[in-house]
């Protein structure tokens, strides 16, 4: 660790001191992060999930945080949240910092050659920009270098940035201006189905004035953004049935119904060519944007043309609206379709069934159960008998079109007023640290933030730090070093909110 002369430190602002600290500690920060990313973090893998939780708790204890503990839900066999706190003498306001340490399930065979989701690798740039692997131990680190690994951006980066922000303040003898509580969830990527149990059982412990969420990417323009809402989320799995056994497509083609064709037509009936969802009543419950939100949207930098070029998209679904406008509407997306084999596994058959996974994103006003109901009614309107089980022989002979619909859990969207006084202080602090900040009414992604208001009566806002091209939820997930290091600075600035 480099010790700076006291007269130099005295001339620097607290944020500048933090930035300098991060620069001198980059190697140590990355060494710790490499250890963290090496622990598998799929929510269903409880032994490794608990290893992650124990690692975080140990980091918090090393920072001398108070009341460090694991908060388990009432339901057994479910990931814990990791909690700790720092009480600041004389502080009158309490911020609760949130990130999640679990990650999406992985298929390591889909990752690029040389990469493994739980063997983090350092590259000189993004893979698509020609990045090459290098050792973690370096004498200096360039801002465009990237770490590849599951959770590198979503959302172990959030955990690391928050912890290192406090470490930087502590190392420089800088006192936070607010009371701070830290809450790191372990079930977010599995739907946070039991988060409410933890919140309900620990209402006094989790009392605060504002939740500050670290999850998601910065704006596609590269600017820091602060987000005042998130979309809700729920899923449906739809299975359409054909013959009871696979049939030879030559012997039975033009005669036996093909479930792949049936499912394709059913899915196509749900959206028109402009991307509008045709499910009856899909948009009826949407709460209109406020005047303040419309004003903020008008100031969001336009990135559509650049993104189309980056992603190789000639035409977006609805050219009349921007991406910023589109994510403020509910959506229906097909996550995946399974019918029969393709490529070397292709066979001349009429398959027995076809399955689609449907993702519904919600905005304020939508109820996730009602939104599911609307889709099910649409399926029925297309002539399908809807069941929740495999069809019986009697049902197969009675109904020509059968769809089995399995509903997942879900959660509603959430918004905090863009005029909230404490949120405005966060905006001022981050703007001072990072310059121009994009203010966004809603994040395109989803987080179960409505439960914080429902059970704790405390509003949340989101301060993302990951690069927009981080491949979260997919193979080759990564974090750009500049985003990680500046994320530490950003969260340190929030911890220094004026009283």
Task: For the regions a language model picked out, list residue spans one by one.
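Solvent-exposed loop/turn segments at secondary-structure junctions
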Residues: 36, 42-44, 75-77, 90-91, ...
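Sec-exported extracytoplasmic/periplasmic mature domains
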Residues: 23, 34-42, 57-66, 167, ...
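A non-catalytic alpha/beta surface segment that caps or lines the substrate-entry region
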Residues: 32, 42-96, 102, 119, ...
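Bacterial Sec-dependent N-terminal signal peptides
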Residues: 1-13
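Active-site metal-coordination/substrate-binding segment of hydrolases
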Residues: 92-181, 486
């Amino acid at each position: 660790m480099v010790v700076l002369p006291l007269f130099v430190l005295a001339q620097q602002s607290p944020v500048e001191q933090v930035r300098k600290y991060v620069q001198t500690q980059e190697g140590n920060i990355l060494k710790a992060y490499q250890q963290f990313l090496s622990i598998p973090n799929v929510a269903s893998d409880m032994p490794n999930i608990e290893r992650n939780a124990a690692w975080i708790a140990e980091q918090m204890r090393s920072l001398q945080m108070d009341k460090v503990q694991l908060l388990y839900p009432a339901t057994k066999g479910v990931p814990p949240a990791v909690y700790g706190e720092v009480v600041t003498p004389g502080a009158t306001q309490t911020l609760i910092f949130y990130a999640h340490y679990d990650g999406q399930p992985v298929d390591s065979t889909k990752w690029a050659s040389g990469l493994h989701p739980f063997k983090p690798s350092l590259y000189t740039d993004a893979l698509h920009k020609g990045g090459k692997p290098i050792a973690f131990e370096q004498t200096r680190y360039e801002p465009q270098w990237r770490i590849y690994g599951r959770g590198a951006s979503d959302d172990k980066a959030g955990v690391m940035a928050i912890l290192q922000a406090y470490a930087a303040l502590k190392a420089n003898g800088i006192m936070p201006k607010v009371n701070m509580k830290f809450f790191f969830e372990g079930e977010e990527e599995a739907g946070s189905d039991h988060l409410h149990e933890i919140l309900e059982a620990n209402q006094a412990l989790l009392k605060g004035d504002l939740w500050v969420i670290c999850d998601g990417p910065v704006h596609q323009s590269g600017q820091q953004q602060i987000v005042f809402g998130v979309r809700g989320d729920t899923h449906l799995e739809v299975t359409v049935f054909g013959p009871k056994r696979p049939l030879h497509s030559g012997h039975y083609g033009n005669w036996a119904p093909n479930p792949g064709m049936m499912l394709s037509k059913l899915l196509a009936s749900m959206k028109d060519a402009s991307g509008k969802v045709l499910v009856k009543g899909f948009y009826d419950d949407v709460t209109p944007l406020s005047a303040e939100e419309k004003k903020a949207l008008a100031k969001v930098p336009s990135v559509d043309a650049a993104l189309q070029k980056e992603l190789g998209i000639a035409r977006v679904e609805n050219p009349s609206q921007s991406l910023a406008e589109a994510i403020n509407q509910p959506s229906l997306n097909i996550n995946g379709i399974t019918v029969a084999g393709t490529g070397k596994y292709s066979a001349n058959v009429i398959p027995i069934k076809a399955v689609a996974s449907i993702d519904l994103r919600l905005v304020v006003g939508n109820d996730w159960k009602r939104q599911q109901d609307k889709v099910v009614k649409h399926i029925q309107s297309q002539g399908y008998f809807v069941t929740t089980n495999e069809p019986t022989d009697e049902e197969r002979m009675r109904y020509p079109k059968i769809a089995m619909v399995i509903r997942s859990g879900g959660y509603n969207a959430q918004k905090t007023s863009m005029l909230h006084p404490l949120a405005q202080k966060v905006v001022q602090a981050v703007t001072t640290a990072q310059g121009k900040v994009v203010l966004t009414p809603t994040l395109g992604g989803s987080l179960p933030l409505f439960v914080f208001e429902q059970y704790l009566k405390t509003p949340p806002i989101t301060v993302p730090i990951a690069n927009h091209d981080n491949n979260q939820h997919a193979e080759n997930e990564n974090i750009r070093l500049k985003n990680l290091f500046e994320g530490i600075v950003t969260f340190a600035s929030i911890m220094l909110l004026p009283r």
